[in-house]
Amino acid sequence: ILLAYRNIKANKGSYTAGTDKKNITDIGSQTPDDVVKRVRFIVTGSEHGYRPKPVRRKDIPKPNGKTRPLGIPCIWDRLIQQCIKQIMEPICEAKFSNNSYGFRLNRSVEHAINRTYTMLQMMNLHYVIEFDIKGFFDNVNHSKLIRQIWSLGIHDKTLIFIIKRILTAPIKMPDNTTVLPNKGTPQGGIISPLLANIVLNELDWWIASQWEENPIAISRGR
């Protein structure tokens, strides 16, 4: 929990407040023991279990004139998400494709470009396919995501219950209306990039089975 706090504090976004108007300084003003106790109480102490506070929706301008929706969880909920990420990430990393570079530790766009260039030279192939999944974060199927998490070997029912609550946290829109989501994972949530990679993991391995293991491609590689 304290490691999660330090990781969040290192990010300047931790000073951005959620719907409860609090930021990282409100956590930092408490003793380490009190922070640990508070997190444990939020997660397991209430009668109905963990209930994240409404996520603040903010529209971020894009260069093309459109906007990108950003979901800003309250700071204590961000701390809980960071704890979950630290638990799940090592398990998931062991199951992810080596050719996946998005939102992963010690991997970047530059690594992906270098890998692509190397493969083009080795295979004597000269085509790269680029595509975008429209509205990906807003359309993640919750039930399928939970099944995918389970298939990766994460079977702790309390943890899965908390993830379900995170996915269905109320969203406070810019016009002050509240939306109860039944799909998607908000861009801006600490755990959202990891959940996105879990959703796309099956696609990564399917692509590998279609092309990476293609005998013709292997022959050309030689």
Question: What annotation goes with each model-predicted range?
Answer:
Residues 1-33:
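Non-catalytic, polymerase-adjacent accessory regions of viral genome-replication enzymes
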Residues 1-13, 86-99:
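Charged boundary/loop elements
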Residues 8, 40-66, 75, 79-87, ...:
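Reverse-transcriptase-like RNA-dependent polymerase core
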Residues 10-17, 74, 129, 185, ...:
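Short conserved micro-motifs on helix faces and helix-strand junctions that flank
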Residues 14, 26-52:
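Amphipathic alpha-helical blocks
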Residues 19, 86, 131-133:
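Residues immediately flanking
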Residues 54, 95-99, 104, 111, ...:
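Conserved polymerase palm-domain catalytic core
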Residues 69-70:
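Conserved phosphate-binding loops in nucleotide/dinucleotide-binding enzymes
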